[in-house]
Regions:
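ABC family nucleotide-binding domain
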Residues: 1-172
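Short amphipathic beta-strand/extended segments with alternating polar/hydrophobic composition
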Residues: 36, 188-189
Length: 189
């Protein structure tokens, strides 16, 4: 999803992720009317099916890198031994093993974003919503993340990304441009 600032891109992601309510219309998630779900059902969907990569990271300052990555697995009820293995895999994948015991304030912005991405994908969601996932990364890291997202998509995860970067948008299969809350164009890549 692309468009100028204020076009409604992040709002659309929040509606798709069931964090915000639409003003009108219907939205179905896994054949369920998302616009009519109660908070308990929305929470269940978040835990089991949706991963979020936020532009502003939303890491928990009082938790280490490893604990931040582990948090969604605790909510999903994953056993401790399995959680540790899954966190270790993410730390290794993102070259952050040496930083596992650091707190977010001790990391650069790019490193914080990598932790946010690892946290979003550690539970292997069916839908990954990414709001400017490469916004605070240098270009090589950005390309690495885009290749990873592409691989996850090939493995069956649906990914909806908001970006201002044309090159990174082309990693997707479809580009939707939004202006003033309306779809301006919808192109297959």
């Amino acid at each position: 999803i692309m468009g100028p600032s204020g076009a409604g891109k992040s709002t659309l992601l929040n509606i798709i992720g069931m964090l915000d309510e639409p003003n009108e219309g219907e939205y179905f998630f896994l054949d369920q009317p998302a616009h009519q779900l109660n908070e308990k059902k929305k929470t269940e969907f978040h835990r089991n099916y949706v991963g979020f990569i936020f532009q502003a990271f939303h890491l928990i300052d009082e938790m280490t890198v490893a604990e931040n990555i582990e948090t969604p697995l605790i909510y999903k009820g994953v056993k401790s031994r399995d959680r540790q293995a899954m966190v270790a895999d993410m730390l290794d994948r993102f070259n952050m093993v040496a930083k596992k015991d650091l707190f977010p304030a001790q990391l650069s912005g790019g490193q914080q974003q990598l932790v946010g991405i690892a946290r979003a994908i550690v539970g292997k969601p069916k839908l990954l919503l990414a709001d400017e996932p490469t916004g605070n990364l240098h270009s090589d890291q950005g390309k690495e993340i885009m290749k990873l997202l592409q691989k996850l998509n090939e493995e069956g995860i649906t990914i909806i990304q908001v970006t201002h970067n044309e090159e990174f948008a082309n990693y997707g299969k479809r580009i939707i441009r939004i202006i003033d809350g309306l779809v301006n164009s919808d192109l297959m890549v």
